[in-house]
C-alpha cells in the first residue's frame, strides 16, 4: 500500500486537517472511507494497532485514546511509512496525553514538547481566518486553541459562524476547510479588525513577544499564565480579557496590590489569632492556583515567583513577636509543598527528619488531612530561603529518597 502526500505540507497544520487533505490527495470520498482502508492494511501488518485506528475524524487525535494510545502511536508510525514525503511525522502533528497537570489539577495535552491545558482545545467550534484560507487551504493547530481568537498574520478576528446559515463552523464535521456544510465559500467573508486584547493574546500564544505580557521563551509557561489569569479573574464566558493587558503591564505590582488589600482586610476583620488562622482564610487559593503552571519552580513560573517574593516580604515585615501576626498563618500540606516547590512526599520527609515542625498535635498513627492547616508560614519561608532552587530542575528535593 502507498499513499500520496498532500501538497504544501507544513509543520503548523493540525492532524485532522492533514488527514482530510490526505483523503483528497488519494481520491477517497471521506475520512471514514480512508480509515477503513488503512485499518484493513493495519490488520495485515499489526492487528493490535488496527484495533486502535480511529474511524471518526473528530476522535482521530491520540489524546482521545486513553487506554489504547500506545497502539495508536504504533499505528501512526506505520502510516508514516506509507507516505512519500519527508515532512513532519504524524506523531509530531498529534496532541498527546501527558501526566503533567495545570493547577488546580487540570488535565493537559502535549505537542512538540509544548504543554497545553486540555480545556483550551476547541471541540465544538473551530473558527477560521478567510484570508489564511485564501492563501493556503489547511487548518493550523492554533485555530484549535480557544484563547487564539485573532489571526496574528492578518490582525483580523477569526470567524466562528457561517454568515449564510449562521451555523457554528467545525471543519471536522463537514470535512471541508474552505466551505461551510451549507456550501458557502468561507474565503469570501469580509474580515473585521481584531480588538487589541484579542490580537495581543493571539500573538502571545503564537510565540511572538509582546511588550505588555511577560516575556517567556517557553510556550508552556505562556499557556500557564493565560490559564491562571482566566481562572482567577474571569468567572463566566461573558467576561472578557480586556483587563489582562493593563494587569500584566504593571506586573507584579498589580498583583502585590491585590495581595496587600487581602492582608489589610484580614487585619481589619480579624476574629482570632493569626497563629490559629489558616492561610487560605486570608489569601484564598493564591498558592494552590499557581502550584503548577505547568512548572513548580519560580524560574519557570512567574506567578509562583511573585507569590513567593510577596510572602518573603510579608514575613520580613511581620517579625516574630509575642503577639501572632500575618507571618504566623497556618499552611496546609499542599500550600507548603507549593511554597517549597516540591512534592507532598518531600514535605512528609521534612517532617520526619525534623526540618518542618507541625503547628498542631496529631493523634497517634494519624495522617495529615490535605486541607488541614499544619505549618507556620514563617517556618516554611525560612526553610525555602535556606535552600537554593536548582535551575535545571522542575522540582526541589530537600532530602534524598529513603
Tell what function each PLM region has:
Residues 1-402:
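Basic, alpha-helical nucleic-acid-binding regions used in initiation and control of genome expression
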Amino acid at each position: 500500500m502507498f499513499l500520496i502526500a498532500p501538497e504544501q505540507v507544513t509543520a503548523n497544520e493540525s492532524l485532522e486537517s492533514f488527514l482530510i487533505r490526505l483523503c483528497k490527495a488519494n481520491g477517497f470520498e471521506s475520512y471514514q472511507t480512508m480509515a477503513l482502508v488503512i485499518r484493513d492494511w493495519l490488520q495485515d501488518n499489526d492487528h493490535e494497532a488496527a484495533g486502535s485506528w480511529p474511524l471518526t475524524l473528530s476522535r482521530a487525535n491520540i489524546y482521545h485514546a486513553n487506554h489504547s494510545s500506545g497502539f495508536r502511536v504504533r499505528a501512526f508510525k506505520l502510516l508514516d511509512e506509507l507516505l512519500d514525503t519527508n515532512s513532519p511525522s504524524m506523531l509530531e502533528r498529534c496532541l498527546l496525553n501527558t501526566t503533567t497537570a495545570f493547577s488546580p489539577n487540570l488535565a493537559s495535552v502535549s505537542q512538540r514538547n509544548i504543554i497545553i491545558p486540555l480545556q483550551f482545545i476547541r471541540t465544538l467550534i473551530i473558527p477560521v481566518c478567510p484570508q489564511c484560507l485564501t492563501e493556503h487551504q489547511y487548518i493550523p493547530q492554533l485555530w484549535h486553541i480557544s484563547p487564539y481568537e485573532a489571526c496574528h498574520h492578518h490582525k483580523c478576528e477569526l470567524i466562528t459562524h457561517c454568515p449564510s446559515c449562521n451555523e457554528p463552523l467545525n471543519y471536522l464535521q463537514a470535512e471541508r476547510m474552505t466551505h461551510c456544510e451549507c456550501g458557502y465559500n468561507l474565503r469570501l467573508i469580509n474580515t473585521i479588525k481584531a480588538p487589541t486584547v484579542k490580537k495581543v493574546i493571539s500573538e502571545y500564544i503564537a510565540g511572538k513577544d509582546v511588550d505588555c505580557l511577560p516575556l517567556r521563551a517557553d510556550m508552556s509557561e505562556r499557556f500557564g499564565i493565560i490559564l491562571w489569569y482566566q481562572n482567577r479573574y474571569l468567572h463566566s464566558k461573558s467576561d472578557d480579557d480586556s483587563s489582562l493587558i493593563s494587569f500584566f503591564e504593571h506586573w507584579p505590582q498589580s498583583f502585590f496590590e491585590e495581595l496587600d488589600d487581602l492582608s489589610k482586610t484580614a487585619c481589619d476583620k480579624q476574629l482570632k489569632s493569626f497563629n490559629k488562622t489558616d492561610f487560605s482564610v486570608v489569601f484564598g487559593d493564591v498558592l494552590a492556583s499557581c502550584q503548577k503552571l505547568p512548572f513548580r519552580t519560580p524560574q519557570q513560573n512567574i506567578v509562583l515567583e511573585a507569590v513567593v517574593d510577596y510572602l518573603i516580604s510579608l514575613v520580613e515585615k511581620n517579625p516574630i513577636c509575642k503577639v501572632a501576626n500575618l507571618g504566623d498563618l497556618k499552611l496546609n500540606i499542599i500550600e507548603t509543598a507549593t511554597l517549597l516547590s516540591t512534592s507532598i512526599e518531600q514535605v512528609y520527609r521534612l517532617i520526619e527528619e525534623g526540618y518542618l515542625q507541625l503547628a498542631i498535635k496529631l493523634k497517634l498513627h494519624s495522617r495529615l488531612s490535605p486541607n488541614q492547616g499544619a505549618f507556620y508560614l514563617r517556618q516554611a519561608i525560612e526553610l525555602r530561603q535556606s535552600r537554593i532552587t536548582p535551575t535545571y530542575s522542575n522540582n526541589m528535593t530537600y532530602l534524598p529518597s529513603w
